[in-house]
Amino acid sequence: MSSPERALLNLLTDIALSFDGAILGLTLAVSAVGSALKYASTNAALKKIKDAPEVSISDLRSLLPASEDKSETNDNRKSNDQRIVVVRGVVKPKISGDEGYKNNNVLISPETGDKALIIQRTQTYVYSGWKRLFQSTGHRFMLERSLRKHGADFTRTVPFVIVGKDQQSNSSFVAVNMDGSRQPLPLTTVYNRLQPINSSFLQAFLYPDYPVGLLDIEKILPPGKDITAVGIYSFNNGVPEIKSCQDLPYFLSEMTKDKMIEDLMEQTNFIFLGSVILGIVSVGILSYAAVRTWNKWKQWNHQRELPQRPNDSVVDDEPEDADEIPDGELCVICVSRRRVPAFIPCGHVVCCRRCASTVERELNPKCPVCLQSIRGSMRVYYS
């Protein structure tokens, strides 16, 4: 780890532990609240998927009223009968117009020539340089490797439908509406190639980071793939349609409904446990910081009120040379003045008046010999 990184780490540590750890406690509390909100949303999604009926493609029309099936709905009109359903089937291109258009309603991968309904291509630059030789063991290097470098990302899609797996004809289907879908797609990687980029010696010498390759990845959704769709089912101009629900983490997936429920239950338990741990730790740290702040405030208030009290003068009225005082009568704290007052209630005479006054000003005054809590002191006179 380099010196600037070490200095930055020390600065962040000092900030987190400042105010008796209150900053760290507040940070953990905010993280706990975020985890609790994440748990609530994940648990709500789990409940929706559990309650969603899993039906076959041919039985979908029975879920909505017949009037909705026959009516021509406007794009701006939202049906009150929309509901979340789970269907499983095979994806096929949507046939529009004559039958001869079927073969042209698919995409062709430019690299492999495979037919596809969705093509997603990602191009990412791979960097190298002499700077990475000195950061190969640091946390900064690990963070940089996890970040995405500049590149290109584009997706092409064609209209497609889901039909029953054992269905002989395409009379029963549900159209897939991809508008507004942000969930991950069940794509298959068909092309993965690292294309080297020639760099000059001057570029490698002057620039700490320079591109050495272009990683080109192509993923497709091939026709005939078995998938599960979970989303909002409705009719669009009399055509059954399913679109994504923004509250759910899945839309098109290779997992079955039972696998989705199992996966969400694991996520829910993990998020719940994490939020509980973060909450307990944050409450403990904030409680510790609050107690420390309260004690400091009491001590400050106690010291502020001391000058207002009618105290005896702490100036020695019996100045003596320390060499003339026997060892058994010297103050155990300063070892330069005679022991005068006795602490109450233990009765020990071990301090001079000045040191005894200092001990009494403490937040929790104790006798320096027996460590018993004291209420004050009184002068002892010897006859």
Swiss-Prot record:
List zinc finger spans: RING-type: 331-370
Q: Known CDD domains for this protein?
A: RING-HC_SPL2-like (cd23145)
Q: Where in the cell is it found?
A: Plastid, Chloroplast outer membrane
TM region(s), chain numbering: 15-35, 270-290
Question: In which pathway is this protein known to take part?
Answer: Protein modification; protein ubiquitination
Chloroplast intermembrane compartment residues: 36-269
Chief location bin:
plastid
Recorded catalytic reaction(s): these are: S-ubiquitinyl-[E2 ubiquitin-conjugating enzyme]-L-cysteine + [acceptor protein]-L-lysine = [E2 ubiquitin-conjugating enzyme]-L-cysteine + N(6)-ubiquitinyl-[acceptor protein]-L-lysine
Fetch the SMART domains from UniProt.
RING
- The top EC class, named as a word, is transferase
Q: Recorded GO terms, molecular function?
A: ubiquitin-protein transferase activity; zinc ion binding
Q: Which GO terms describe its biological process?
A: protein ubiquitination
User: Which InterPro entries does the record match to this protein?
Assistant: MUL1-like, SPL2-like, Znf_RING, Znf_RING/FYVE/PHD
Keyword tags:
Chloroplast, Membrane, Metal-binding, Plastid, Plastid outer membrane, Transferase, Transmembrane, Transmembrane helix, Ubl conjugation pathway, Zinc, Zinc-finger
| Membrane topology, from the record | Multi-pass membrane protein
Source domain of life: Eukaryota
What would be one Pfam family of this protein? GIDE
The record's Gene3D superfamilies line, in alphabetical order, gives: Zinc/RING finger domain, C3HC4 (zinc finger) (3.30.40.10)
Topological domain (Cytoplasmic) residues are 1-14, 291-383
**GO CC, any one term:** chloroplast envelope
Functionally, this protein is described as follows: Possesses E3 ubiquitin-protein ligase activity.
Identify the PANTHER family for this entry.
E3 UBIQUITIN-PROTEIN LIGASE SPL2
Under which name does UniProt file this protein? Answer: E3 ubiquitin-protein ligase SPL2
Species of provenance:
Arabidopsis thaliana
Q: Which gene encodes it?
A: SPL2
